[in-house]
């Protein structure tokens, strides 16, 4: 008989309780307010992000999701990745952290993961690969 060596958890909504609609509303609202001083118009910015996200979900594997997102974002906004990527990275390191306020907390999550690791299991977290890694790492810490 084969022994299980890995345990798979869903991050969003399981280890990190959240109402997806509330989270997206808060996140996009804060992102739009943060980017407004740099000349971004809220509706255009949000449309560019949704369209870029859609492009990632349709990715055929010929490029990374990140490359696919930025190519789409550049077409819609007329802005170059090289000039904007650092600005967005800074947002995810600072402003995005405020989105933790609309996430819940499951006190059993961290304890369960810790106990499984102590027993020698590999713990794998599943999430849609649609956020930049800095945002995914933040959501893991929040859980």
Annotated model-derived regions:
Residues 90-102, 109-141:
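Substrate-recognition element of Asp-dependent hydrolases with the DxDx(T/V) motif
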Residues 20-25, 62, 133-134:
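Short, flexible/disordered intra-domain loops and linkers
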């Amino acid at each position: 008989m084969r022994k299980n060596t890995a345990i798979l958890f869903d991050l969003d909504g399981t280890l990190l309780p959240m109402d997806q609609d509330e989270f997206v509303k808060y996140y996009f609202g804060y992102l739009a307010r943060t980017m407004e001083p740099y000349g971004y118009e809220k509706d255009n910015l949000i449309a560019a992000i949704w369209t870029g996200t859609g492009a990632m979900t349709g990715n055929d594997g010929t490029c990374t999701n990140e490359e696919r997102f930025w190519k789409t974002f550049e077409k819609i906004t007329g802005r170059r990745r090289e000039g904007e990527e650092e600005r967005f990275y800074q947002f995810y390191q600072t402003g995005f952290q405020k989105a933790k306020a609309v996430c819940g907390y499951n006190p059993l999550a961290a304890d369960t993961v810790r106990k499984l690791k102590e027993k020698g299991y590999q713990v794998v977290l599943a999430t849609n690969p649609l956020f930049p890694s800095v945002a995914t790492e933040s959501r893991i810490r929040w859980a």
